A protein has these predicted regions:
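Flavin (primarily FAD) cofactor-binding/catalytic cores of flavoenzymes
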Residues: 1-209
């Protein structure tokens, strides 16, 4: 609530350019994944004040790099949701954030200590449910990406659960429609294999025409 009333700057992950534009500013980073962590580590040198908030607890792993097993399980959950036509869960909710040396150092010096999500945004800052207020000049929304499917409405592919049933990269309702980067392909463990799969499927489909 109040997002439109904020008088400072707001950017999403895809609009973020670099940390230098936040020199001397009080910056709020919103999100609980690796993008939020990366922004905080980069902004630390330039921002006058940094605040990190997340809707959920951030799961810092004991591993120093992404655990392939956890990544595979997260992708499997994406695949299950895509096959059922449900809204897709985030990858990081299943993988957690690896505790690299740089990230551990950020934790040790108090930088990577997320606060709970604020209750509302005000023109010059944010306020929590207990009344605590913090002035903010800029907000970086590192909240991930949602599949943008509205432009596909004329194809009538969406299910009542809110998603599109996708199996092996193609629509269950219309196998001629392929979804590269959707569901289990939107992965932090690498999309090359999925990209090759889609390419082979497209070629096979075209060869039948």
């Amino acid at each position: 609530p109040g997002r439109d009333s904020f008088l400072g700057s707001q950017v999403h992950t895809n609009d973020y350019v670099d940390a230098t534009q936040y020199g001397g500013k009080r910056v709020l980073v919103v999100g609980g994944g690796t993008s939020a962590v990366g922004f905080l580590l980069e902004l630390e040198e330039y921002a006058s004040e940094l605040t990190w908030v997340s809707r959920r607890n951030v799961d810092f792993l004991d591993e120093t790099e992404l655990n392939m097993e956890a990544g595979t399980e997260a992708v499997a959950r994406q695949d299950e949701a895509a096959r059922a036509g449900r809204a897709l869960p985030s990858i990081v909710s299943g993988t957690g954030v690896p505790r690299t040396r740089r990230i551990q150092a950020g934790i040790d010096r108090g930088l990577l200590q997320p606060k709970r999500m604020f209750e509302r945004i005000e023109p010059h800052g944010v306020r929590w449910a207990d009344g605590t207020y913090r002035d903010v000049d800029a907000i970086v929304w590192a909240t991930g990406f949602r599949p943008e499917l509205r432009h596909l409405a004329p194809l009538k592919l969406r299910e009542k659960e809110g998603g599109i049933v996708v199996a092996a990269g193609s629509s269950w309702r219309d196998p001629r429609v392929f979804f590269a980067g959707y569901g289990p392909q939107a992965s932090t463990i690498g999309a090359n294999r999925a990209g090759r799969l889609i390419a082979r499927q497209v070629i096979a489909t075209l060869s039948k025409l």
